[in-house]
Amino acid sequence: MPSMGTYIKAISGGAILCIGGPALVMWVTPTEEEIFKRYSPELQKKALARREQTQQDFDNFTTQLKELSKSEKPIWIAQKEADSHRSETEAQAKRDERDAYAAESRRRQAEIRASSQ
């Protein structure tokens, strides 16, 4: 049977690995600001220009997830239904736009025919 010293060594070694490993990763990993400072000036400008849009997209995504999580259905089913509803709405909007364009085209043709007679 191992001695008490062996148990202490094993426990202390495990503690060093379990606590020290994540601490080392946190210490070595650069922050977002440090990564941003390493960018070239043109990449910094692009990142600053996209930052607001990216933040807005993320806010929209989280808001949508919060709304979908209120339903009784699993979130992936609710997401699929919301996507299909949104695609139907977009398709209807495209059809309406196409119909309006066709009606405008017919109206112009009628005006041209009426003015040429």
From Swiss-Prot:
Membrane topology: Single-pass membrane protein
InterPro entries per the UniProt record, alphabetical: Cbp4 (IPR012420)
Entry keyword Transcription regulation: no
Stretch list, region Disordered: 76-117
Subcellular location per the Swiss-Prot or TrEMBL entry: Mitochondrion inner membrane
Signal sequence bounds: none
GO cellular component, one term: mitochondrial inner membrane
Residue ranges of the TM segments: 7-29
Keyword Cell membrane: no
Record key words, sorted: Chaperone, Coiled coil, Membrane, Mitochondrion, Mitochondrion inner membrane, Transmembrane, Transmembrane helix
Basic and acidic residues: compositionally biased ranges: 80-111
Superkingdom of the source species: Eukaryota
Coiled-coil regions listed in the entry: 45-71
Gene Ontology biological process terms in this record: mitochondrial respiratory chain complex III assembly
PANTHER family registered for this protein in UniProt: ASSEMBLY FACTOR CBP4
Similarity field: Belongs to the CBP4 family.
Role summary: Essential for the assembly of ubiquinol-cytochrome c reductase. It has a direct effect on the correct occurrence of the Rieske protein, core 4, core 5 and apocytochrome b.
Descriptive protein name: Assembly factor CBP4
The organism of origin for this protein: Phaeosphaeria nodorum (strain SN15 / ATCC MYA-4574 / FGSC 10173)
Encoding gene per record: CBP4
